[in-house]
Amino acid sequence: MNDRVNIRRALISVSDKAGLVELGRALAAAGVEILSTGGSARALREAGIAVVEVADYTGVPEMLDGRVKTLVPKIHGGLLGRRDLPEHLAQMQRHDIPPIDLLAVNLYPFEETVAKGSDFETCVENIDIGGPALIRAAAKNHDSVAVLTSPAQYDDLIAALAAGGTTLEQRRRLAAAAYARTAAYDAAISAWFAQQTGEMFPAHLALAGARQQMLRYGENPHQSAAFYRTGNRPGVATARQLQGKELSYNNINDTDAAFECVAEFDRPAVVIVKHANPCGVALGADLAEAWDRALDCDPVSAFGGIIAVNRPLDVAAAEKMASIFSEVIIAPDAAPDAVELLARKKNLRLLLTGGLPDPAEPGLAWRSVAGGFLAQTRDAGRIGRDDLKVVTQRAPTNAEFADLLFAFRVAKHVKSNAIIYAKAGATTGIGAGQMSRVDSSRIAAQKGGEKIPGSVVASDAFFPFADGLVAAIEAGATAVIQPGGSIRDNEVIEAADAAGIAMVFTGMRHFRH
């Protein structure tokens, strides 16, 4: 069965002019009548391509400052009329509505306008009305009409022209892409309006992203995966990859965890992550010192890990990092000599983001569950010294206060149950993801070994019993930070006082699952 549709008439109205002239020339060479509007018509005409202005074609002038251009029956009837129904064809002939076989439209740059921080009125003016209406009409009638919504689709369309027209399979693919685009566009508008009105969780919440990369596989080789970009928060989605192999699903997940963690700190910091959990976090006078101290926490787990820094990467730090095998280094920027040095490690992926994510920036996080998804605000909670409540007879020293705040900030990024030992601005032991808090405490102490005595300890949630605290005391901890709130808080406080250690409550929990 020959399901090719020969293109005789096309409507082009694009805000993104990339590839427009090449598409226009191919259509003109194939004898296609080109209808167009505004800037698209002007660009085609300047390239010597004959076009018919939509206003001349329909007899209806553009109006309302260009808000109404194509919202007329002659255009929508030409897109929606079914060529296989005699009654449709008769009505089209009676009302002088010729069929339109190809639509090329991309939408006003609403997402880009919002990302630039434009004012409310400018954002509203960049909400496209006619474009989505055209796209949906053409996609609905894909049996007869091909719809292009991206310059990336032009080459295949040009090839189809040479082959005698578009196939049904091609038109269906284009229709699917068209509806995905309008859905994403409407989702962006809906999310922006919800933000403007302060409605974090509207009755209908749409998720939309632009596919940035097809991945080799997902978390495991038998799973398929892709990476979608949803915004401009600095991180792996915005990064330039200077070298190394293609990022994997696990690389992206782990790199995001590392970069979000390292952004928590004002001083030069290094975070090493393995399986989305930090295995070493440290501050330093510079990145080289921070690296040495972060690596010292757990050098075995650091092998094959992800490295994140919160300063432009210098050559001294890069040289140290190059001494072990790592999957990814992510940084806001890097010095040319550091880039040159790391280029010797061909498999190492080097990502430069141009900035750091703001830990306090509001936003939503999602997680899929069977039959739906959970939405919650991002964990943007940050505790300062003034937020701490000393609950023991002994108060922490100034040095302990600094380490307690550092350790609790790390705990926010470790899978629950999380126990963090730290000393002088560096982790000395990390216990992650255990079903009981006492086990996390013991594992962290075991991994830290002789580094643990003199450390402070942070817990991402309250100690339900004194046993987890006792394990930390036995390991040599001198001060504790935890949210508090257990019905056995008094029992835990008594254990701390009996051991002569200091303990503070934050009133804020940092579960992470």
UniProtKB/Swiss-Prot annotation:
Biological processes per GO annotation: 'de novo' IMP biosynthetic process
GO molecular function, one term: phosphoribosylaminoimidazolecarboxamide formyltransferase activity
CDD domains cross-referenced by the UniProt entry: IMPCH
Keywords on record: Hydrolase, Multifunctional enzyme, Purine biosynthesis, Transferase
SMART domains (UniProt xref): AICARFT_IMPCHas, MGS
Ranges for domain MGS-like: 1-149
UniProt pathway: Purine metabolism; IMP biosynthesis via de novo pathway; 5-formamido-1-(5-phospho-D-ribosyl)imidazole-4-carboxamide from 5-amino-1-(5-phospho-D-ribosyl)imidazole-4-carboxamide (10-formyl THF route): step 1/1; Purine metabolism; IMP biosynthesis via de novo pathway; IMP from 5-formamido-1-(5-phospho-D-ribosyl)imidazole-4-carboxamide: step 1/1
Matches recorded under Pfam families: AICARFT_IMPCHas (PF01808), MGS (PF02142)
Matching InterPro entries: AICAR_Tfase_dup_dom_sf, Cytidine_deaminase-like, MGS-like_dom, MGS-like_dom_sf, PurH-like
Enzymatic reactions: (6R)-10-formyltetrahydrofolate + 5-amino-1-(5-phospho-beta-D-ribosyl)imidazole-4-carboxamide = 5-formamido-1-(5-phospho-D-ribosyl)imidazole-4-carboxamide + (6S)-5,6,7,8-tetrahydrofolate; IMP + H2O = 5-formamido-1-(5-phospho-D-ribosyl)imidazole-4-carboxamide
Any Gene Ontology CC annotation: cytosol
Domain of life from the UniProt record: Bacteria
Record-listed E.C. numbers: 2.1.2.3, 3.5.4.10
Protein family (similarity comment): Belongs to the PurH family.
Domain notes: The IMP cyclohydrolase activity resides in the N-terminal region.
Protein name (record): Bifunctional purine biosynthesis protein PurH
Taxonomic placement: Bacteria, Pseudomonadati, Pseudomonadota, Alphaproteobacteria, Acetobacterales
